[in-house]
Amino acid sequence: NQIKKSNTSTGARIPKAMTNPADNFAGGQWKPPGRRSARTSATGMFVCEHCLRAFTTNTGRGLHIKRAHEEQANEAITTERSRARWTNEEMEAVQAEIDCEGRTAINQEILRIIPYQRTIDAIKCLRKQQKYKTIRERVANRRAENRARETELTRLETADEDPASQEQDNPNMSLKNWLKEVIESDDDRLCADLRTAIEMALAGQSPLDVCTVGCYQYTMTNLPLVPVRLGGPIYWCNAQSRSNPGETQRRQTIKESNNSWKKNMSKAAHIVLDGDTDACPAGLEGTEASGAIMRAGCPTTRHLRSRMQGEIKNLWRPISNDEIKEVEACKRTAAGPDGMTTTAWNSIDECIKSLFNMIMYHGQCPRRYLDSRTVLIPKEPGTMDPACFRPLSIASVALRHFHRILANRIGEHGLLDTRQRAFIVADGVAENTSLLSAMIKEARMKIKGLYIAILDVKKAFDSVEHRSILDALRRKKLPLEMRNYIMWVYRNSKTRLEVVKTKGRWIRPARGVRQGDPLSPLLFNCVMDAVLRRLPENTGFLMGAEKIGALVFADDLVLLAETREGLQASLSRIEAGLQEQGLEMMPRKCHTLALVPSGKEKKIKVETHKPFTVGNQEITQLGHADQWKYLGVVYNSYGPIQVKINIAGDLQRVTAAPLKPQQRMAILGMFLIPRFIHKLVLGRTSNADVRKGDKIIRKTVRGWLRLPHDTPIGYFHAPIKEGGLGIPAFESRIPELLKSRIEALGASNMQTARSLLGGDWVAERKKWINTQKIKNSEWAQKLHLTTDGKDLRDTRKAEASYSWIRDIHVAIPASVWIKYHHTRINALPTLMRMSRGRRTNGNALCRAGCGLPETLYHVVQQCPRTHGGRVLRHDKIAEQVAIFMQEKGWLVLREAHIRTSVGLRKPDIIARKGQDCKIIDCQIVTTGNDIRIQHERKIQYYASNWELRRSAATMIGHQGQVSVEAITISWKGVWEPRSYCLLRDCGIPKVKIKGLTTRVLLGAYLNFNTFSKATYRTERRRTAN
């Protein structure tokens, strides 16, 4: 039997005669081919021992095993060494473990620490090497620096400041002086209640009374409040609507879905895409279990009186107006239990400063500001497990505003460990994921050992001890007044748990930070800094000149080491550090990955038979093909996996939901596509996959908007300002976002992140970016170069030309909104449109007998059948403009007939307001010529006639100059910029100008509809040029 070679000449399939197991028996015994089997005597082929596939070369067989049998290929790698080799991490660990000062028998001590595959002679040779001496000096210098730092910190914490310096630098003195200046200034903007409170404060009365009189009474009595509603899931239809049959049920369902959309667009979109993830059994079980976690803790430290040296005292300086305006309360944030809205709070700008400074002077705030409601957001539907809830505390708007100012002040001093990349002004997600990807790639390329531990901390934000927060603030040298205030807030705060419209009872948390409070992320980072200090400095993965021992993003910890012993030491240290802060790891949710080099074979093996331990519990060890997620990016042992854009199912759910096309487009652009952006940018993908995803989206949108199949591709992806639909294209968006995030690494304050720019990982990503076939900015040009899209090239010049497209609140009926798009992109079925690609002479002439090609422009703007519609459209626009101007106080004269020496002139509008008088004429023009030229021609038509201007002034009762203006709009709703500016200068709001645009488009579609239904044919026949 002869074997036919494959096209690649690297492999062939064994004929059936060869794959018969009996062929491998010799003398009654089975003889399987070896891992490096030689050529078979009969065929001269190399056979795979796993699937019996034959190859012409041994290299081809090896590549086949590596790709088709990954697990078997990984297990076949041998990592055992004939003799031990010393790594830099191991030498630093040994030197850090022993104390060389005044000790003897150091060689025996080293042998005791690392007994495996080591001898006394080997240790002696190692200690004579210059590399070991350099490491010994570096370890000694690091130990000396740490000792000096700890000594200084202990001295600052135990030593009190000199009383004279305390009095001179006391932050409260500057606050007291500021309050005196406010009282003496007689500022009218200061209300009586607040003035009384400041006077009481300066008189030394009770802080609680001062805060109650000055802060709470003023804000509660003088600001409008809103009732606080319990949050809950949104349902598309209730039980009653399900019982209604047929058309009634459909209408009721659509009505309720539209109401849900208006109440909470984001939640309604998530229900469409994910189902009702907020739904869970009603009752107080979830609130009681979560409340038990918050109440379990040690008593909070009481008021501190001793000040430590080196405090950053300017953190407690008086608050300025610039700071208040810089972090003004967001208008979209929810109100707290007191019902105060952000709009009301931001309206008392000068009083806010006085309130905040008085709070700082006393170190306390009104107790009602401390009350919050904690909404438990379930991570999984139907759960009652406390670990599966995400608590979000919503306190008073005033307290959140004040704490945001304090958080900004602390953040400006750079007090946090640079390894912590969460809640800072940096792209921490991109930095950490890129570093992890780069380290895995370097370990495989350079055959280096890499051990990774992905840790999960149990309810980290809810479990941190309050005493740990206080210790962390002391280490960061925050002033005594700020520390006392923060601890007073945590000692006196109350909250009420809410889950799915169910209220729990008021509780006083004894542990955890207040998630939702602007200060909480910074406080948690300070606590995590204490945990990171426990990591051994000699352990980590050496990448270039930097050693990376951990990647940290809030409570997401990834530990790295070059040796197994190094990673186990880091795990033990981190476990001890977390326990000191009242935190604990969840071993069942932790994972480790061991990439072990094989020096002889020049390969990397994923080991799984030697697990790591945390708290005497083994951690799950990831295998060769196992996957895990870190910061939203899915990894395996080779790095980020290839991301598939599985968007078809989500699009089908959006299509099946009872939504209007405007709502579907909003969900697509605002919620669905952004779900894929993160993992596509930071993960891996291919050009073929992103183009396939774009094709699926375009196909679905064509169905939603009933667009023909040959609609220009640029119309889907061009920005709305350029006349398109503004749908982000994966093909162009992903490479540009990846490029911008890579460039941002160069501005990072972390040296290891900046060093990535010269590495292999970034070079590989840049190489893929350069394969980009179209840029994001080229979609507009792609649209404007087509026959259907060239008329939209001036859209960006006036906001009214495109503002109607994003109609997320469904102000325009759905069927009409679709027809507007058909009109703009020439999608209405004219003969010229329908005969594309199969047109012959004469078969596309106008059905009205005009003798001209039946284009959409001809039907709407030229054909005699639609003349009456064009007149009505023009008159309606002029009428609406006149009404809008009258509403703004203009005296308007409509369609005045003025006879001049050159003939009768009938300007649409003559308007006067004060000393301003205008002659305005409206026109709806074609876009074939420059719309600017047509606009100037219309103005010149009236401006050159001095008799017209004089008669118009006389008719309207004006004595001064008369200006001539024109309102020029194309029949596709594109405005001439000066026309738009004219109406805005006249005081007409944008929303009404947008209505003029849609009225023009509606008139164009009605003209086409009239043309299609009419049977009138003109007697005068013309032939096309």
From Swiss-Prot:
The species this protein was found in: Nasonia vitripennis
EC number of this enzyme: 2.7.7.49
UniProt zinc finger (C2H2-type) residues: 46-69
InterPro entries: DNA/RNA_pol_sf (IPR043502), Rev_trsase/Diguanyl_cyclase (IPR043128), RT_dom (IPR000477), Znf_C2H2_type (IPR013087)
Protein name as annotated: Retrovirus-related Pol polyprotein from type-1 retrotransposable element R2
Upper lineage: Eukaryota, Metazoa, Ecdysozoa, Arthropoda, Hexapoda
Coiled coil stretches, renumbered: none
Entry-linked CDD domains: RT_nLTR_like
Record's compositionally biased regions (Polar residues): 1-11
Cell inner membrane keyword on record: no
Residue span of region Disordered: 1-38, 146-172
SUPFAM superfamilies reported in the protein's UniProt record: DNA/RNA polymerases
Gene3D superfamilies: 3.30.70.270
Biased composition (Basic and acidic residues): 146-158
Alphabetic keyword roster: Endonuclease, Hydrolase, Metal-binding, Nuclease, Nucleotidyltransferase, RNA-directed DNA polymerase, Transferase, Transposable element, Zinc, Zinc-finger
Gene Ontology terms, MF aspect: endonuclease activity; RNA-directed DNA polymerase activity; zinc ion binding
Enzyme class: transferase
Residues passing through the membrane, by range: none
Location of the region described as Nucleic acid-binding endonuclease in the Swiss-Prot/TrEMBL record: 755-1025
